Amino acid sequence: MDIRTQPLAAAPAPVLRADYAPPVWQVPEIALEFDLDPARTQVTGRLSVVRAGDGPLRLDGDGLTADSVMVDGVAADWAMDGDQLVVDLPGNAHLVEIRVTIAPEANTQLMGLYASDGLLCTQCEAEGFRRIMFFPDRPDVLARYAVRLVADRARYPVLLSNGDHVDSGTLPDGRHYADWRDPFPKPSYLFALVAGDLAVNRDSFVTGSGKVVELGIWVREHDLGRTGHAMHALKTAMAWDERVYGREYDLGVFNIVAVSDFNFGAMENKGLNIFNSRYVLADPDTATDQDYDAVATVVAHEYFHNWSGNRVTCRDWFQLSLKEGFTVFRDQQYSADQGSAAVKRIEDVRVLRAAQFPEDGGPLAHPIRPDSYIEISNFYTATIYNKGAEVIRMMHTMLGEAAFRAGSDLYFDRHDGTAATCEDFVAAMEDASGHDLGLFRLWYRQAGTPRVHAALDFDAPGGRARLRLQQVVPATPGQPDKQAMPMPLRIALFGEVSGTKLLPEQTVMLDGAHQEILFEGIGERPVLSINRGFSAPVTIESDRSAADLAFLSAHDDDPFARYEAMQQLMVDTLVDDVATGNADLAPVIAAVKATLADPALEPAFVAEAVLLPFEAYLGDQMPVVDPQAVTRAWDRLRGALGAELIADWRGVYAGMAAGGNSLEAAGRGMRRLRGVALGYIVASGAADGPALAKAQYEAAGTMTDRQTALTALAMTASAERDAAFAAFHARYADNALVLDKWFQTQALAPRSDTIDVVERLARHPDFVMTNPNRLRSLVGAFAVNQRAFHDPSGRGYRFLGDMVVAIDRINPQTAAKLVPPLGRWSRFDAARGAMMRAELERVLGTEGLSKDVFEQLSKSLG
């Protein structure tokens, strides 16, 4: 089916930012009562509504039928207009009471109220509350919630909701109740409840003003011992937010609940955060060092939302980056303060380049403040979150720490208790700093990753260097013509002979398509270090030679720039090898050797610096992606690095064993570098490689060492590989989170038979279609494995298409997140592109597609 020629009469209508209108009715107070049962939950809502404009009361619903509707205690006339319940109200203030019945255990979408592993829990962002109760389900309607939960005490002994617990008691027939009150107005997407048999890790935090906050992390009894790290992270984040942003917690209780089935990573519901269990549970036997970091980051992120998202929320969903971009920036700052800021910056940029840059360069490109959507859940993207954070970071760089803090204080003071816009945030920054951010607003309006070309000329007799910058913002869907965007570029010059910085670092504001900067008093040939610290989310193109990049990888005093020089040297070499098959690998090998030998570098940084770029990122550097050529070049360089430096890798592997099982930063860094060394030893083809990895697996005292060994073995065809995977499954068969690693490691394996393995795993008894974590670990991981997904047979495309269709019937939101890898069809060679496009068309022709998947498919086809 070609959507260019076939009519789309049933296509859902888009929602437009330009059509925003304030709500006609506000709901300052709502009382909810839940009679909880997995098969049949009765919900009663009492809405105090106040007129704010002209028109009837319209309440959103999704799959709901009203059992009764009363206005001011009297049965009322009402009608359904699509999914909206409409009531004509004569006056300006009324009490509307509505009763509905819902079935949580039948809710496989995991939006609204649903059942998960014996619990009842909610997910309401973005539009899940309308699956619970008829309500103006939009973020600019803020209400104070009073909630009563009633349930069977034996089955659901713990009853939690937002705010403060105010009462509880027993009822006849073995039932009980709990009453919760949230004194702070909040939008419906922040409502939450959890009911179940849970154990709690309790602690407390004393705020700067002396208030004692009760903290609770609620999990299954057998998981209680794995919550200590999350609790420590929560208390650390609370103290950090007071110190860095002046934000103090406002309720008397803060609860976190871990659930097994969850579409997102976590949710910042006021006072009752609900988390995917993978971001709560951690101990050395089941969680890698990376998992520990993820738990700390996500706990902090959701806590920080209490101010940047809850106390000040979004006017409409087009403003989503207002809360998410700002909060990601805040959690990045926090994580950088807890460990190595350099390594954290490298990790953040790697994620941006792997997820957001391709999004910005494909059919799903959108600004951080979009102009339209069909299904808002499709805009919980790397652009909104990660690029949004980079836009905030640029403001921080341009204004400076003090002015940025003044701007954030003003923003919170002005808009506390209201629904704000991205414009409100920028205006607060302008007003507090006196800095004109007029042109900077282009970052909110324009999609696409700017490309900046930098050329440095040196006039030796005159002692001058001239830097010429040229910016291009590529066309994206719906935006063919772009303006140049202002950006801060941190720049330094290093002497080629002295190896030292020739001038202090400068922050250059590139605010046009072309710009020249003159440097005086330059006594030797300068080497350009640009976009230091990744000060702007752009692609830099320069005339720096391999020798220049190798020089910077050894001498640049900005850790990110040093890492970036090594990465660019690798990328240039690999791109050359893709084209010629005979690139000179010696400069890369020498640069890696020098980095390994530098005693001044922390092991965690070295581990990042010597890793090859992802194959997918390498493909992004090419006009047309040839996956097989990329794989050949990548394998050649990886093998050469392993073989030529085998003695170095063995030395590193032995030396880094001193890190042991320590969870301190030094031990974690040593484990990371030791794992990288093991990977290169195995890639070298050394006869003892598989045996070395298997020995590490068997002796491992941490999941990090065990997972590293398993990953190294995954690329081999060896008896050791088969034995290790069998042993891993046997050991962790009853731990769903760890078993996700078993699936994911095989799906990501750089092997020619990975498609066979993945198809077999999709039939494995432990593959559960209803669990988003399991789907992401197998299907999602496979789709980003460039060499396996793009198997020339096209089997990878068919597998993903079949999965999207099957999952869409269960969980449309998760299904839609799997479409983008197929949507990049125009970037690949003709044969692959045709197969990918055909698969998109086949899936689009499926009857009964959700609007979530329809939007992704239709945009991907163009």
Per-segment meaning from a language model:
Residues 180, 208-462, 466-467:
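Hydrophobic alpha-helical and helix-loop surface patches within well-folded domains
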Residues 102-109, 474-475, 534-540:
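Short acidic/polar inter-strand loop motif in beta-rich domains
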Residues 354, 381, 520-862:
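Long, ordered, helix-rich scaffold segments
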Residues 65-71, 436-439, 449-531, 642, ...:
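Beta-strand-rich binding/interaction modules
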Residues 46-64, 134-137, 143-152, 423, ...:
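Surface-exposed beta-strand/loop patches in extracellular or lumenal glycoproteins
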Residues 99-202, 440, 558-562:
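Extended, low-hydrophobicity, Ser/Thr/Pro/Gly-biased non-transmembrane segments
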Residues 1-42, 114-119, 123, 130, ...:
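N-terminal, polar/Ser/Thr-rich
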Residues 35, 54-56, 61-116, 137, ...:
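A surface-exposed beta-strand-loop module
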